[in-house]
Amino acid sequence: INHFGEKLRWCMDLLAVDYEESNVGGITSIILRGRTVPWLVDRLSCSLIGNSDEALWYLFAVHVPTMQGDAAQQGAALLRRSEETMAWEERLNALGHAIQGWAYFYLLATNADPDLSLRYWGGKEPTVPLLHRLAQRCGYPAFKGLMRKAFALDDESLHQKRYDTFVAVLDDADAALELKGGNHLTGESISYVDISFCALLGPLLPSTIIPLWANGRFSSFAPLQDHPSMPTELVDFEDALQRRPCGQYIEKMFREWRNRPFAS
């Protein structure tokens, strides 16, 4: 599961972009590429973009002008930037890192079930290359140690700071939805901010979002819906998030907009 990959993939699906997806193991990509964020490769223009935000602006410049009718208007509205959306960009980028560190505190705890992390990393996903899956399974103890060190998971104060960071963003999202009448975070139409927010928080709602993640492409994620080893803290957080307006908004967005493109 890659938050930023889902953001880009979801936007491309809404825009009906004709693309081919190549999946890599979540942790092995650090070794192969030096990073885990998605790449957008346009062979026609020989372009390679390694940042999900910049990939969206590329699509805005190259793909949206080729769209027709209502879909073109929706596509332009989806990717249009404003002072408000750019302010959200900064908050959501911080949110992504905070969520990762906070969740890994439990998923990579000393007594954590390796099956959870391996599924989140794609270690049991048939669409991920076999060698990547084998590397993740065989190298799990080493990867776990490296991730614990990289995210400073022994630092209790940092763990609390991460939690406070993303709860503050959730409060902002609840307030924005109330201000906008419950439609979307930044206005009447869907924005890339809405997609980013939902993609970042979706993995923390596994009981409802996992079947809809990536439009249901990854069969190995299914056991995460009701995994017997899911940490209690993550289960409790999901329950609390589902009671929030922003949590209900995330579920609504996945149900209504994850499996269809804009209508032309």
Describe every region a protein language model picked out:
Residues H3-W10, G50-D53, W57, E83, ...:
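A structural signal for well-ordered alpha-helical segments within the folded catalytic domains
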Residues I1-R133:
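GST-like domain detector, emphasizing the conserved glutathione-binding G-site
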Residues A199-P261:
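Short His-centered aromatic/hydrophobic patch
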Residues H3, I27, C138, A142, ...:
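Cysteine-nucleophile amide-bond enzymes
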Residues D13, E90, D171-A175, E251:
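Surface-exposed alpha-helical segments enriched in charged/polar residues
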Residues G96-G216:
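GST-like fold's C-terminal all-alpha helical module
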